[in-house]
Design a protein with these regions (language model features):
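A post-motif C-terminal structural segment
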Residues: 1-25, 74-383
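Extracytoplasmic mature domains of secreted/periplasmic and thylakoid-lumen proteins
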Residues: 25, 32-93, 98-99
Length: 383
């Protein structure tokens, strides 16, 4: 179905692989910048995003993320900051944005900014806070912030998937017949790839497919007015296919990396043996019948874990969980090469009305200009 695929460069202004903030700025503002700048150029000058520029053209604007609402990938669409972790600045900008719809998995992260304070700020700015299960109670014309754990690895029964939220938001934003921009980010895919948790990453990729399905259904009803752009802020983990992959293996792992690590920490605190810890790790990733060589690898990782030691090959993560997941991945034809970002090109897919404006797409910073041209404003990003 998707014939228009473009190899896309994602390096930052210094020529290295971009971070979430730098790549988010490129995608939202059309400018390559330094690693941790959000909606600022390399000299710290503020940039105006595609979202703000389209809002000035009377477009409705919606922002959805399955992560925290201050996530550095989506924040440059509405906030300006010189560092990635400035949640108060981001929330303040969100409140001033006047955007029509936001949805996120949570309002804050850590103890730097209490969720209660964020809630108060949003309500004072005229936003209605809506729990995920009440997605269908929202009405056109309202300014809503939907709070819902839409991640496949966290979602509870009865709460909407990321695709459901996308469909609901598109319906609200299009109700008055005017144009709209809806940005949907599945940041959890990046989160799990950084931890080399292939099973959880694959589950979240399937969850993101529900977003694409929702977009395609909307496009089928409005074929002359809808443009779908599917891209990535950057590559992380450098996951490669090394052999024939067994289907469905990722569904057997019921716990995420962090949940598995917490369980092993608890077992260790209760003085369980190495063999018990190894057996628990293997059970959680559904690996059976390990060879002597594989068992020795797990023993070394277990000792490192118990001694609180870190080696480069395990990054900052739990060695035993990482080694168990690596054994599982090897059996399923997958392999990670790093825990960090890479400068590898990503693929941008374009479908729908105005897709011809992307033929010259080379860099992620070209994307907002192409979208603006498709919307009928060819010089919007250069004004």
């Amino acid at each position: 179905m998707f014939k228009n695929r473009y190899k896309t460069e994602v390096i930052d202004a210094t020529g290295i692989g971009g971070s979430a903030a730098a790549c988010g700025t490129a995608i939202s503002c059309g400018v390559q910048t330094k690693l941790c700048r959000m909606a600022q150029d390399v000299n710290g000058r503020p940039l105006k995003s595609l979202a703000y520029r389209l809002k000035e053209q009377d477009f409705k604007i919606g922002i959805i993320t399955d992560s925290v609402i201050t996530d550095a990938t989506i924040a440059p669409f509405f906030a300006i900051a010189s560092r990635c972790h400035e949640p108060e600045k981001v929330i303040s900008a969100l409140c001033r944005s006047g955007f029509d719809f936001f949805a996120a998995g949570r309002l804050s992260e850590g103890n730097s900014l209490p969720a209660e304070k964020v809630t108060e700020s949003l309500i004072s700015a005229g936003y209605r806070i809506v729990p995920g299960k009440k997605l269908r109670t929202m009405n056109p014309g309202e300014r809503n912030v939907l709070l819902s754990l839409s991640r496949a690895t966290k979602r509870q029964p009865g709460t909407p998937a990321l695709g459901d939220i996308t469909a609901g938001a598109a319906g609200l934003l299009s109700a008055d017949g005017k144009g709209f921009l809806l940005v949907v980010s599945a940041g959890s895919i990046d989160y799990f790839n950084h931890r080399n948790d292939a099973a959880s990453a694959l589950r979240e990729m399937q969850n993101f497919e529900s977003v694409i399905d929702a977009a395609l259904k909307f496009a089928s009803r409005h074929p002359e007015e809808t443009l779908i752009v599917i891209t990535s802020d950057h590559e992380s983990g450098e996951l490669s296919i090394t052999g024939k992959r067994a289907t469905g293996f990722h569904l057997k792992q019921k716990y995420t990396y962090l949940e598995m690590s917490d369980r092993l920490v608890s077992l260790n605190q209760h003085k369980h043996t190495d063999e018990r810890l190894i057996a628990s790790a293997l059970k959680m990733v559904h690996v059976k019948n390990v060879s002597d060589t594989e068992h020795r690898r797990l023993q070394i990782a277990c000792r490192l874990f118990r001694a609180h030691r870190r080696l480069k090959r395990y990054g900052t993560y739990n060695p035993l969980v990482i080694e168990a997941m690596r054994l599982r991945d090897e059996r399923n034809g997958l392999k990670y090469s790093t825990f960090g970002y890479t400068a590898k090109h990503i693929v941008t897919v374009v479908y729908g009305s105005g897709e011809e404006h992307f033929r010259s797409l080379k860099k992620n910073s070209d994307i907002p200009g192409c979208i603006a041209a498709a919307a009928g404003f060819p010089d919007l990003m250069t004004r």
